[in-house]
Amino acid sequence: MPRSLKKGPFVDEHLLSKVDAQNDKGTKQVIKTWSRRSTILPDFIGHTFAVHDGRKHVPVFIDDSMVGHKLGEFAPTKTFKGHVKDDKKGRR
């Protein structure tokens, strides 16, 4: 079930303050964050976030198609190695 519209999107305060500070200065440095649960706002467009995936920080460049999604959606936590080959034919 989606979040109520009267509450608005959730964004961690420290993340929003870092983006506002960079927008005021006019800089576009990488912002390191562990907040995968924060919603991407239109103010974030053009910034690069280093989102933690549990092991390392994955750089995520924000564009307009990402607005409304969560930061964690763009930093996968699991790597798929592929399925093991079935050797039933070779056992005969």
Curated annotation (Swiss-Prot):
Superkingdom of this protein's organism: Bacteria
A biological-process GO annotation: ribosomal small subunit assembly
PROSITE patterns: RIBOSOMAL_S19
InterPro entries named in the record: Ribosomal_uS19, Ribosomal_uS19_bac-type, Ribosomal_uS19_CS, Ribosomal_uS19_SF
UniProt xrefs under Pfam families: Ribosomal_S19 (PF00203)
GO cellular component: cytoplasm; small ribosomal subunit
GO molecular function, one term: structural constituent of ribosome
Sorted UniProt keywords: Ribonucleoprotein, Ribosomal protein, RNA-binding, rRNA-binding
Record family assignment: Belongs to the universal ribosomal protein uS19 family.
Main function: Protein S19 forms a complex with S13 that binds strongly to the 16S ribosomal RNA.
NCBIfam families on file: rpsS_bact
HAMAP family for the chain: Ribosomal_uS19 (MF_00531)
Protein name: Small ribosomal subunit protein uS19
